[in-house]
Amino acid sequence: MARVCNFSAGPSMLPEKVLKQAQAELLEYGDSGQSVMEMSHRSKWFDAIITDTEATLRRVMNIPDNYKVGFFQGGATQQFAMVPLNFMTTGKADYIVTGNFSNLAAKEAAKFGEAKIVASSKDRNFTYIPDVNAIDYDKDASYIHICQNNTIFGTQYVELPQVEGVPLVADMSSMILSKPVDVTKYGCIYFGVQKNVAPAGMAIAIVRDDLLGHAADTVPTMMNYTTLLAKDSMYNTPPCWCIYMTGLVLKYLENDIGGLAKMQEINEAKAKVLYDYLDGQDFFKNPVEHRYRSTMNVTFTSPDPDLDKKFCAEAADAGFVNLKGHRLVGGMRASIYNAMPAEGVDKLVDFMEKFRKENA
């Protein structure tokens, strides 16, 4: 059976070359005589895997030496609690709410202190990003939190909030590794890996050194960043398979794609094809303000919810799967992460045009 074009928002596509390498090494990794899924996390083979994965991430993202990198269980949702537990030293933090996940992060933080929503785009159903330069930030806030790309609503930041002395914390789950990022602009970057990096089951956090070591003694051991980071992500058994797969994807980005600048060029070209089509006809609509349109997650609707259902069903039959929009938005959503080939987007546009002609 031919592989489908998978537009899932996550878990999502992985590069076929990476899958084939994992397949080839599934029963025996190197000369270990065992699968990565079986080996001890204290073995010399896995020690080499986790060390190389972190080193490759540092190269690919140009992460400075004064930042720690950690591989965490629990996904990005666990980070919603870890961030305030570790960083809310003044008892308050600023949150910009631009979608479901930033809202959930703010709600979680409110359990541990004052999580002030200083700006929100809820008034227009999260179809834009608030002007970060017009926000009244609290200079005594422990940090400013954003979700840099909004998976559900299809928006992304084009400018970052910058307040002197207040660290920026960003959830980058649905845009990480899609383009170069200046890590030095952030105090902490975290992301679930299941959208653009690896299979589900892990989050990665990149934390500036000066933010560590301030958690209260009452913070649970496994919710304290310092616990894991001081032990190079090996305080307890880490998500070994996810770390291995992350390493394969990073090597693919570095060696086959040519780095994040090249990946950005490819991604923007893919998104342009889809947005140009949406703007060139009147059947399908994208609700997002042009300036804030996501490169990774493209939302659209047809003239009628019943047609949306018909579109998704016929698309699946044609090999385009997981296009149904999130229940908060409806319609359709095409997640075109790094692993989605340009040909997949081209074929989707052809199918959309065919559907339009048959149903307009």
Protein language model regions, located:
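Active-site phosphate-binding strand-loop segment of PLP-dependent enzymes
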Residues: 10, 109, 120-176
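Conserved PLP-binding catalytic core of the aspartate aminotransferase-like
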Residues: 284-314
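Active-site C-terminal subdomain of aminotransferase-like
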Residues: 188, 193-275, 289, 358-360
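Conserved N-terminal alpha-helix of the aminotransferase class I/II PLP-enzyme fold
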Residues: 33-79, 86, 100, 108
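PLP-dependent aminotransferase-like
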Residues: 77-142
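PLP-dependent enzyme catalytic core of the Aspartate aminotransferase-like
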Residues: 2-4, 330-360
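A glycine-/small-polar-enriched, mobile loop at the entrance of the PLP active site in fold-type I
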Residues: 3-54
